[in-house]
């Protein structure tokens, strides 16, 4: 038996460190030097992804990675549809951190809030989306997959060859997710492109419009979702902007949670959360408009009378219901047939299939992550049938739902198209998972330079001895002041946890409680015209912002005084186990504190 060699404590420590690094997937062995809680969250960079075998994708960050020991018993890979984004270099992250500490924030003018789609996507450039290459039934599955991978690598190579990483926004690098889009477009008779009304230009890729209306010859319906989060005049202005530039579009306004007329319109009530009214999904605004758009497209080729009858029943039920709670609405109504299409994206089915087959119209719902695709389906059905989450990438694969025997809905996973948007704006749009952001401070600075965050949250400058004195603010100061106000401290040193505070501010922005709305070109000059537009008045009445309150249950507002509730929301988002709604602003109904978090009613010392 060989003699045992001495093994020092230092060697043992190094062995354990190497073992932990291997488990975390760190190839370079770098570890964060920070001893704070924020440093522990930022310490990992994702493993280099070379699964596609090309140098174009050698700096890919894989988000929502699930622990897996290989394929499951049925050959299912839980990480097959995870988000793939280009990874920021460590030098770039450190540079942005320094800028967040040093750069003084200056408010921008209203003209800088105007977004032109030609500046974001540059139609006609290489900022396109990957198309499924030509194929034939004589090809095997392996040949088809190999051809698609080569085509996808060429697509990525053209984009990265034309633009530097600093100019490009985050966009999807996972071929499996693009295959889901191909399948949805091939099986759909009508395509719904869902966008967020706060920044619809961000969610509207012109290349998809040209492909759907031109090459496929399908009707495209643009859904401006979450209209309760924007002023009615701005909603009408965006509607006319898209009608003017894309005449083949059918534009529909939608929200799953119409604003209650008794909800105060005070922008300073950021920390107020409204209790959700009962039968919330049946109150969705927009199903009637969507039905009229589909009737104009199908022109009698499909019998949609059952859909109209369903909408009438939902409206009658919402009027009759006494708001007894969400449990009641989950049980009401007929069952909805759900089909999970986990591997259908790999099937070689062409887009030339029969339209309105068997008298059924298939409506495909596509769009960016976190724009409310799943919430829209719940609003159309009238109750919760689709799991929704604030975390982008929650929908892993497309599913089909029969709204009525003649109407089939198809929910596609969210996809990020390549553009030239600032990455900070993408974070504020909810495209990137907030819990996995390496450097959230510049996004906070981007937000604070466009809306008065300090005034809305009543923040006190961390270096101010006199509260009435004026001090210059930087993004780091705002995060530190919010951490002090909320009591966010690091675990060991009890310093202000600025990383957690920055994440909290970004969640408020994504949820709509810190609402940042962008405008179409020329809106600032014509704001008065849009405010007096007849469609604006009609939308105000439709949303229920004016008029009698009605015989509904009273709503209560409770202030977010406990940090435990917000921490619970953060954990649910990070683990992707939360099934909260994608829209939870002040104006939207929200469930009670006790219902959302059993620890929210405890005092600060009991958490």
Curated annotation (Swiss-Prot):
Extent of the signal sequence: none
Basic residues bias spans: 1-14
Residues involved in GTP binding: 225-228, 367-374, 411-415
Residue numbers of Phosphoserine PTMs: 32-34, 51, 68, 324, 561-563
Compositional bias segments (type: Acidic residues): 550-584
Tree of life domain: Eukaryota
A Pfam family it matches: MMR_HSR1
Keywords: GTP-binding, Nucleotide-binding, Phosphoprotein
Modified residues (Phosphothreonine): 48, 50
InterPro entries: G_CP_dom, GNL1-like, GTP-bd, P-loop_NTPase
Gene Ontology molecular function: any one: GTP binding
GO cellular component: extracellular space; nucleus
CP-type G domain mapped to chain residues: 178-418
GO biological process: DNA damage response; signal transduction; T cell mediated immunity
Biased composition (Basic and acidic residues): 15-26
Segments of this protein annotated with the region Disordered: 1-81, 547-607
UniProt keyword GTP-binding, yes or no: yes
Domain notes: In contrast to other GTP-binding proteins, this family is characterized by a circular permutation of the GTPase motifs described by a G4-G1-G3 pattern.
Job description of the protein: Possible regulatory or functional link with the histocompatibility cluster.
Family of this protein: Belongs to the TRAFAC class YlqF/YawG GTPase family.
Name of this protein: Guanine nucleotide-binding protein-like 1
Organism: Homo sapiens (Human)
Gene from which this protein is expressed: GNL1
